[in-house]
Every structure is written in C-alpha cells, then in structure tokens.
Amino acid sequence: MESTLKEMRDGASVLDMDPKSTVGGGVEDVYGEDRATEDQLVTPWTISVASGYTLLRDPHHNKGLAFTEKERDAHYLRGLLPPTTISQQLQEKKLMNTIRQYQLPLQKYTAMMELEERNERLFYKLLIDNVEELLPVVYTPTVGEACQKYGSIFKRPQGLYISLKEKGKVLDVLKNWPQKSIQVIVVTDGERILGLGDLGCQGIGIPVGKLSLYTALGGVRPSACLPVTIDVGTNNEQLLKDEFYIGLRQRRATGQEYSELLHEFMTAVKQNYGEKVLIQFEDFANHNAFDLLAKYGTTHLVFNDDIQGTAAVVLAGLISALKLLGGSLADHTFLFLGAGEAGTGIAELIALEMSRRSKTPLEETRKKIWLTDSKGLIVSSRKESLQHFKKPWAHEHEPVKGLLEVVKAIKPIVLIGTSGVGKTFTKEVIEAMASFNEKPLILALSNPTSQSECTAQEAYTWTKGKAIFASGSPFDPVEYEGKVFVPGQSNNAYIFPGLGLGLVISGAIRVHDDMLLAAAEALAGQIKEEYLAKGLIYPPLSNIRKISVQIAANVAAKAYELGLATRLPRPENLVKHAESCMYSPAYRYYR
C-alpha cells in the first residue's frame, strides 16, 4: 500500500503501476480500476457492440428468453440465458400474472418501471394489450403517489434533469441525451403535480408516464421521446427536509431567474432538435402555465395538456352528451367549480366550438359559461381584482359565495369540477342539479381519486340514477336500484397521444386552436349508440390506438388546411398514413 501511494505521489499513472502490488493472483487489471484508489480517476470503459452480456442489459434490444437459437449463436448469448426459448406472448402472460399478484398500486408501478428498464418492447406490449388495467398504474392516479415517494423508490435516472446549476449550459445538457432524433418533449417544473402540489424535482415521474402513453397509445417511437424536469427548487418544506429528496435543496426560484432558465431551455431545444419538435408543458403552476403558452405559442410547437388537452377531451364528452341531452352546446348553460388553467382552458374551447358552430361572436358564447373560484361566482363587480385569465368570464350577476347558492342561481345542466379539492360536490349540490335537470351532466375531473369532487357512487345515488357522470380518475361500475352504471373517464389520454401523432406525421410547426377542435370532434365521432345507452360519453379505452389514429388524421388534415404542415406532399389517405407511422412493440429479429 505504501508503495502504491509513493507511486501516486510521484505522478505515475494507474496503468503504469505494477499489477502485483495490488492484485493478488486475479485476472489482469487491464484498465487499472482495481488498482485505483478512491480519489483517483478511472475511465468508465464500455463495450459499444450490442452483443452478449451487453445486449441482455440494453432495454432497447433485450428480448430475454425470446432470443431465438440463431440469435443466441450470432450474438454470443450461449450460456448467458437458460436453454429454453419462449414467445413474447408467453412473456406477457407471465408478467401480467406477476403484476396481478401485487396488492398495492405502487408495487405494480415499480414492477412496470423495472420492466421498462430491462425490456422496452415487452413493457409497451403489456401496456398496449392491457391498457384499461395498466393505465391507472403507469399514470393517474398511481403516478401521483410515485412522485411523492420518488426519492425513496429512485433507482436509476429517467429523463433529463435541468437545474439552476446548468444555467448557461442547457444546450450542452441536451446534447448529453443519447437519442438525437427527438420528436416529443414533455417538460415540468414540478410546481403543481396533479392535485398534489409542489413536488419539485420528483415531478419527473409525470413526463416519464406521459411519454410512455405517447408511445403506447399514440404510437410515437420511444427513442423520439424526451422527459425533462426543470429544477428551480421547491417550496415543499417536507421535501426540503427529506434526506432522500433528489432535487435542489432551496426555495423555488421565481421572476427573472426562472424565466431566463426557461427561455434558455426553449431556445436550446429549437437549436438542437429544430422547430418541429413538440414541447408539452406539464403541471406548471397557473401563472407560469398561461404565460409560457402565450410567450412561446407563436414561436415554438408547444402544447399544455392541463389547459388544452383537458379542454379537448371534455369538449369531446360534451359533444357526445348532446346526443343524450338534445340541442346544441349553445342551448345549454355550463358551470365550473375551479377557474385555474384546466377550468378556463375548457371554458374557452367550449366557447370557441359554440362560436364556430353558431357563427356567433366569442364574447357572446362565453356568456353561457360561468366559473366559480375560492371567492365564489366570478362576476363583473370582481373584475379589477381578477387574474387576467379569469377576466373574460366575469359576467353581469350579483355576487354569490357558496357553490350550492351558485347552482341554484345559475341552474346549469352541466357541472364541471376542476378545483383540485375533493368532496366539493356535496349531496345538496348534486340534489339541486337533479331537481331542475332531467339528465344532469356531472364531470368531477380533479385528480387523483382522493381529490375528485365526488365519487361515481355519490353522483348516481344522489340523483337517483339520473346523472350522466364522468371523472378524471377511474371509478368502478355502480349498481343502483338493480341497474349497473359504468362511469366514464374524462382522461386526457384520449386526446394527447393522437394529437401528438398528428403533429409529428404532418410536420406541424405550430399548435392551432382549430387542431384542438379537430381532435375533440374526432374523439366524439368514435362514440357509438351502444355506449350512449349505458350513459357513457367516451368510448372504451381498449380501442385507444384506433381512436388515436382517427384523431391524428383529423389533426394532420387541419395542419395541412391551415398551411402549418411541412411534410409534403400531403399523403392521400391520412388514416392509413397515421397507422403506418405507429410504433409496434413486437420483437424484431436480429441478424
């Protein structure tokens, strides 16, 4: 040991040292790793050819026991795998049996994430073939719990972490990502994760989960997806004190420091990947969400799922519900509990659709839509104190405080909850809705399940089976007086994967409101009479890939119509083109 330290002090390289001084009768230490002391640098050598041991640990190419005899010979896998060869279908069956044995959703989530880290195609095969069962596992509501506990369950990095430490070097950080042909980026700053608040850097679970759905449901290649978290600190005291927290331990940066980092990121993305890369803003706080969309909507291909995606999926549900309610959107009155990014985004898209259909000015159609916030009904007498995104919804009416009083005063046929506060649709509120509506439409959209404004059981029971109900998080079927009601799920997963695919295949350079309307109309067009007969206003998620194809084709058509598409010439059949562009998780055969 003394001789080793002497050689180090004399400036000798690790590779120049006598192997016998530190390695006792073992394999020769070619790279000097065993001879290096803890404070000495070594080179992290890797084998670049995907074969043998390396191939089995490459999630993009690993097939586990599904490697054929020929592949095992060609890629030096003999002896590295048990002798049996099984199909991808049998692998899927085995893993689903294992996952179903777990009692806790978080255990299932962890199992799925571990599968993605070792066999990417099998992960997507499971998710696509079992979408209704696994969607709540890899995304809402389970992903919320995963983000809360991310520091404890963190094993290996997923996605790209850009913190204030990287300010001035963001372009270099983007270049560290191994995949170069990126088409979709989902980025969060972790300030408003679902209905759970500020989770800081641990919000990375949301972009990771979202992009897995872009692939599974929308067919965007996994290698073309990039999850990003912008870490500017957190105001969550619990996380700041948590020894396992993985992010910056400081209060959240705001103002110029925040906007400069975001601007550097947006500029670097365009510089590195071009202007046809879709950037989806995810779970930003209200003030930043609206500002970012307004600031970059004219210069980048940007989309906010909380504002625009939620709006499109709710609008699709309302268009479907008209077949049960009768009339047009303009014939009905809408009331929102919650006037944040989701509430105002939905309201604006409903008003826009009304305006397009009825050829009425937007200012007029907005008057059919009422919003309430924590201070009560948004009315014109409050206009001076309102945030800018609430002002278009301040109508002439006397101030009304409580939700029950608002419902009785406005008498809406549609009640939409986007408050992020659970149990706010009380028995009295729901009963009031049923008292003046033959079929009250109740949408409890807040996530996760614990934050839902009411449950499906409550909606059906309190309206005596009259309600048309849909929620943001899934609920089990409800039996009331001998009849089984199947609650719909107003899940953004119906819209954003198909929208993303449509933007990618058309080479769109901007997201236009008419594309959102096109996506909503395509989704509403997939609802059949048999679904409506059960009170469903959304089609089954089991058909989501086919639905995404229709949405993608509609969105792409609108991009070409608006002159925003760059992939020319336009394909003759956009539906077939969308299908042909979708990623398939089936195993490839290797030479």
Swiss-Prot record:
<dbReference type="InterPro" id="IPR046346">
    <property type="entry name" value="Aminoacid_DH-like_N_sf"/>
</dbReference>
<feature type="binding site">
    <location>
        <position position="306"/>
    </location>
    <ligand>
        <name>a divalent metal cation</name>
    </ligand>
</feature>
<dbReference type="InterPro" id="IPR012302">
    <property type="entry name" value="Malic_NAD-bd"/>
</dbReference>
<dbReference type="InterPro" id="IPR015884">
    <property type="entry name" value="Malic_enzyme_CS"/>
</dbReference>
<dbReference type="GO" id="GO:0004473">
    <property type="term" value="F:malate dehydrogenase (decarboxylating) (NADP+) activity"/>
</dbReference>
<keyword id="KW-0963">Cytoplasm</keyword>
<feature type="region of interest" description="Disordered">
    <location>
        <begin position="1"/>
        <end position="26"/>
    </location>
</feature>
<feature type="binding site">
    <location>
        <begin position="335"/>
        <end position="351"/>
    </location>
    <ligand>
        <name>NADP(+)</name>
    </ligand>
</feature>
<dbReference type="InterPro" id="IPR012301">
    <property type="entry name" value="Malic_N_dom"/>
</dbReference>
<dbReference type="GO" id="GO:0006108">
    <property type="term" value="P:malate metabolic process"/>
</dbReference>
<feature type="active site" description="Proton donor">
    <location>
        <position position="139"/>
    </location>
</feature>
<dbReference type="GO" id="GO:0051287">
    <property type="term" value="F:NAD binding"/>
</dbReference>
<keyword id="KW-0479">Metal-binding</keyword>
<dbReference type="GO" id="GO:0008948">
    <property type="term" value="F:oxaloacetate decarboxylase activity"/>
</dbReference>
<dbReference type="InterPro" id="IPR036291">
    <property type="entry name" value="NAD(P)-bd_dom_sf"/>
</dbReference>
<dbReference type="InterPro" id="IPR001891">
    <property type="entry name" value="Malic_OxRdtase"/>
</dbReference>
<comment type="subunit">
    <text>Homotetramer.</text>
</comment>
<feature type="site" description="Important for activity">
    <location>
        <position position="306"/>
    </location>
</feature>
<dbReference type="Pfam" id="PF00390">
    <property type="entry name" value="malic"/>
</dbReference>
<feature type="binding site">
    <location>
        <position position="283"/>
    </location>
    <ligand>
        <name>a divalent metal cation</name>
    </ligand>
</feature>
<protein>
    <recommendedName>
        <fullName>NADP-dependent malic enzyme</fullName>
        <ecNumber>1.1.1.40</ecNumber>
    </recommendedName>
</protein>
<feature type="binding site">
    <location>
        <position position="306"/>
    </location>
    <ligand>
        <name>NAD(+)</name>
    </ligand>
</feature>
<feature type="active site" description="Proton acceptor">
    <location>
        <position position="210"/>
    </location>
</feature>
<keyword id="KW-0560">Oxidoreductase</keyword>
<feature type="binding site">
    <location>
        <position position="447"/>
    </location>
    <ligand>
        <name>NAD(+)</name>
    </ligand>
</feature>
<feature type="binding site">
    <location>
        <position position="192"/>
    </location>
    <ligand>
        <name>NAD(+)</name>
    </ligand>
</feature>
<comment type="similarity">
    <text>Belongs to the malic enzymes family.</text>
</comment>
<feature type="compositionally biased region" description="Basic and acidic residues">
    <location>
        <begin position="1"/>
        <end position="10"/>
    </location>
</feature>
<dbReference type="Pfam" id="PF03949">
    <property type="entry name" value="Malic_M"/>
</dbReference>
<keyword id="KW-0521">NADP</keyword>
<dbReference type="GO" id="GO:0046872">
    <property type="term" value="F:metal ion binding"/>
</dbReference>
<dbReference type="GO" id="GO:0005737">
    <property type="term" value="C:cytoplasm"/>
</dbReference>
<dbReference type="InterPro" id="IPR037062">
    <property type="entry name" value="Malic_N_dom_sf"/>
</dbReference>
<feature type="binding site">
    <location>
        <position position="282"/>
    </location>
    <ligand>
        <name>a divalent metal cation</name>
    </ligand>
</feature>
